[in-house]
Regions:
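Active-site microenvironments that recognize anionic phosphate/pyrophosphate groups
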Residues: 1-223, 227-230, 304-306, 320-324, ...
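Helical scaffold of the NTase/Pol beta-like nucleotidyltransferase catalytic core
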Residues: 194-196, 228-253
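Hydrophobic faces of well-ordered beta-strands that scaffold small-molecule active sites
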Residues: 209, 253, 270-272
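Histidine-centered divalent-metal-coordination microenvironment in nucleic-acid enzymes
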Residues: 218-225, 263-279, 367
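Catalytic or ion-translocation cores adjacent to nucleophile or general acid/base/metal-coordination motifs
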Residues: 236, 245-265, 274-326, 332-335
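Beta-rich nucleic-acid/ligand-interaction surfaces
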Residues: 260-268, 346-352
């Protein structure tokens, strides 16, 4: 039986174009080595299109039975099956060569090849991504995307305990470093033998291009500095974003802000995120135009969006880089006490920007979301951050992806919403259920709006209401609210430019 599983994995590699006929025996022997099997007989017959997840599970179960896994749990299974996938992988240099050959024909052909490879290699686990729950909700700002992320596996208690005991290794320095390519992983760091990177030169420095293993949206890519330098928003950031867009005009690219609370989860390594997807924010129109002295040729305006976003457009990206630097410098030093905007308190800076670049037709576009990370006694997690009334759905930072209109909600919500829907249909008291109690005030608020609620439509209603909460979260993160007062304070800043 195990011979059949091994042959199926090699057949999968052939079908995916990872392994050619010439590589078949080599790949088989590599798998035998990883499986610690010395005897092999080619099976008579195997399926034409073996399923990868099923085949790996057969191999993993066998390895676990024979004591090759420290524990038979997801962390150790992932470390082991990545070692198996490595047996099918082309060398990093071959991948880069193929990418460059295709790029000479068209950038999109090159990214198509690389994206497919990143999935075929199981670096992106398609069968896990398929578990993510996604929907979209209409709002005053356009259709907002919501997702409950289930593709990051929950660690089991044994792995968590082992990770605590494991000595802290400084290699690779972090999950983004180029040293991850081919790294075997450990209990507190994923295996990356099946991971490949394309080197790029942007702003005359060496950067790497890869896909995110968790694919929050189509062709979700990460562009990262080959040096482990911290995140920084500055003129060079805008240069690098546009250098990337000139290389891959079919992609957008953006950067997280460089301050805690309003930044992303990794501030220690300079990186950007991009992809082949049109977010609600990119579709949102300019609601009010402005002319900025010295930049009369640049189309400038405030975007109709819950966060405070300035959009600038021009056919020459150098004009946008100059203006973006001007806006960034003005915003970093800007205080307006009436609007509760403070550039700094006690020497700690608060103002920064989340920038997003794209090309529309022959015009370059740069969206600058104004961010401020001030905290107060009433809002210890941040004034322009999800407020406490929404924490039952989302309390994490609002980073780049959320700024653009895609909610990435915690996995716990899947079970909580299912439980909640049962309670609502049966008319039970939500407050009486320990893990649902946190949702009770929210339920009290929206239930009166839905007399039509029944077992057929309850989940749709919950999804719609979660969407409204996320819009509220984005409004919380906006420095200038979408009210007459907020918009006139925003205009006041625009006039200072």
């Amino acid at each position: 039986v195990i011979n059949e599983s091994i042959a199926k994995l090699v057949k999968y590699g052939e079908n995916a174009g990872l392994v050619s006929g010439l590589d078949k025996i080599y790949a088989t022997n590599r798998i035998l080595e990883v499986m610690q099997i010395s005897d092999y007989e080619e099976p008579e017959q195997i399926p034409e299109t073996p399923d990868l997840e099923e085949t790996l599970n057969e191999l993993l179960d066998d390895a676990a039975k024979r004591g090759l896994l420290e524990h038979n749990s997801v962390v150790y299974r992932d470390l082991f099956d990545t070692k198996l996938m490595d047996c099918l992988m082309p060398r990093p240099g071959e991948v880069v060569k193929k990418f460059e050959e295709l790029y000479a024909k068209s950038p999109q052909e090159a990214t198509d090849y690389f994206y497919k490879l990143s999935q075929d290699s199981n670096y992106i686990r398609r069968y896990r991504i398929a578990k993510d729950i996604r929907w979209s909700v209409p709002s005053a700002y356009g259709d907002i995307d919501i997702s409950i992320n289930l593709s990051k596996p929950e660690k089991d208690p044994k792995a968590i305990a082992a990770a605590k005991l494991a000595k802290q290794s400084g290699y690779p320095k972090c999950l983004l470093c180029k040293e991850n390519v081919g790294y075997a992983g450990r209990v507190n760091h994923p295996a990356r033998q099946n991971h490949r990177i394309i080197p790029l030169t942007i702003n005359q420095t060496e950067w790497g291009f890869q896909y995110s293993p968790y694919v929050y949206y189509n062709e979700h890519c990460i562009v990262f500095n080959f040096q482990h330098n911290p995140m920084k928003i500055e003129r060079a950031t805008f240069v690098k974003l546009f250098d990337f867009i000139k290389l891959f005009p079919h992609y957008f690219i953006g950067s997280n802000a460089d301050l805690p609370i309003v930044g992303g989860s990794i501030l220690s390594h300079d990186h950007y995120q991009g992809g082949h997807y049109t977010f609600a924010m990119a579709k949102a129109p300019i609601e009010r135009h402005f002319t900025i002295k010295g930049y009369e040729d640049v189309e400038t305006g405030i975007v109709k969006w819950p966060l405070s976003v300035i959009r600038i457009r021009h056919k020459d990206e150098k004009r946008l880089i100059d203006l973006a630097e001007h806006i960034l410098n003005c915003w970093r030093g800007y205080t307006d006490e009436d609007a509760f905007v403070f550039a700094e308190t006690d020497g700690e800076p608060h103002n920064t920007i989340t920038p997003i670049a794209r090309k529309v037709g022959d015009t370059f576009e740069l969206d600058l979301a104004l961010r401020n990370n001030i905290t107060t006694d009433e809002c210890p997690l941040g004034v322009y951050h999800p407020h406490a009334q929404y924490h039952h759905i989302k309390k994490e930072n609002i980073g780049l992806i959320e700024v653009m209109g895609l909610a990435i909600l915690p996995a716990r919500l899947k079970d909580e919403l299912e439980e909640l829907s049962k309670c609502l249909v049966e008319g039970k008291d939500v407050r009486a259920v320990a893990e649902l109690e946190k949702h009770a005030d929210w339920v009290d608020e929206f239930l009166p709006r839905h007399p039509e609620l029944n077992s057929e439509n309850v989940m749709d209603i919950l999804k719609e209401e979660v969407g409204k909460v996320f819009v509220g979260v984005l409004e919380d993160a906006g420095v200038y609210k979408c009210t007459e007062e907020g918009r006139s304070a925003f205009a006041k800043f625009m006039e200072t430019l």
